Amino acid sequence: MLSKFFPHIKEKPLSERVKSRDAFIYLDRVMWSFGWTEPENKRWILPYKLWLAFVNIVMLILLPISISIEYLHRFKTFSAGEFLSSLEIGVNMYGSSFKCAFTLIGFKKRQEAKVLLDQLDKRCLSDKERSTVHRYVAMGNFFDILYHIFYSTFVVMNFPYFLLERRHAWRMYFPYIDSDEQFYISSIAECFLMTEAIYMDLCTDVCPLISMLMARCHISLLKQRLRNLRSKPGRTEDEYLEELTECIRDHRLLLDYVDALRPVFSGTIFVQFLLIGTVLGLSMINLMFFSTFWTGVATCLFMFDVSMETFPFCYLCNMIIDDCQEMSNCLFQSDWTSADRRYKSTLVYFLHNLQQPITLTAGGVFPISMQTNLAMVKLAFSVVTVIKQFNLAERFQ
């Protein structure tokens, strides 16, 4: 069903040419709309840069400030539930501004990484290897659409309910607009801005996921090549050595690819790790003490979306660490015992390098892994425990 509207989420046949960079098709389109890429025609650079400045000043600077001003301007009108709902989104929005800035600054690095993907694609000659690339490309685009559905559902669940209740869903401050007298205008403006904000946040969450997904694609292809070393009879020792050398080049390209992306994702995931415990903690307090049924459903969706910002990426990083161990096993288990001295010495050098796992760190501090992710999520329970011990929830009710 979805593939009728989004054809790139379906695996393409081998008769069509597909490149690894095609996994970013839908993501790049959204980024282009925010001014985060470059126009194809150079004569549009100036208007595009002006659009970039306008959109990002409004969304990354003025929008978080508008939520903060609303606290100062109309704090007494907030109920406890409304305040917590606004606070959890406001905190996440400030973090999202930093995440978007890191992603925007890393545009050139991401372009360098795509060039390296093109070089890795040149090694995919057999139908089996090309089919693997096609499958991962479709998976990358599918993840982008899936995140759009998850994130959009949060807005769709919130906006109609609060509109019918004649209450503002996110309590933003708009100068020269009376939010009570011009309720529908301010509510529609809130809905539009929140939708744009979550799509910006989506880009910062999906970009690392798809990028490392394509890294895992080529790691899996390299594992298969390592298994097949010296498996074709009738070749000379020089040809076997050249085959091993090509695998070493592939591994070097993979390391360069990850190194190009490392500074881009380091800051993004670091900010999210700092936020996830606090945001989930505030959401859990709101859910446990102040939510109605409908606002509780919306809060659960928000908590799910916040968890999706780090969980899939951390899980993928763990899988890549395991893949690196498997790569060294594949090389060691290949048919090298009858090889000449040159081949064996090259293999030993390569085996040593393969045993170094491909890892990412958040801000140069936290290793990006499921263990770190779970440790940060546990902070949410610490926040709830503090609130319950001091009976703060009862005081606000």
Swiss-Prot record:
Membrane topology: Multi-pass membrane protein
Outcome after substituting S328A: In strain: LA6
Tissue expression: Expressed with Orco in 17-20 sensory neurons on the medial-proximal edge of the antenna. Expressed in the ab3A neuron which responds to ethyl butyrate.
Result of changing T292S: In strain: CN13
InterPro entries, alphabetized: 7tm6_olfct_rcpt
Result for mutant: S220N: In strain: CN14
Residue ranges that the UniProt entry lists as topological domain Extracellular: 71-86, 158-182, 281-286, 378-397
Keywords from the named record: Cell membrane, Membrane, Olfaction, Receptor, Sensory transduction, Transducer, Transmembrane, Transmembrane helix
Impact noted for substituting V386I: In strain: LA6
Family in the record: Belongs to the insect chemoreceptor superfamily. Heteromeric odorant receptor channel (TC 1.A.69) family. Or2a subfamily.
Subunit structure: Interacts with Orco, via conserved C-terminal cytoplasmic loops. Complexes exist early in the endomembrane system in olfactory sensory neurons (OSNs), coupling these complexes to the conserved ciliary trafficking pathway. Interacts with snmp1.
Protein name (record): Odorant receptor 22a
Native source species: Drosophila melanogaster (Fruit fly)
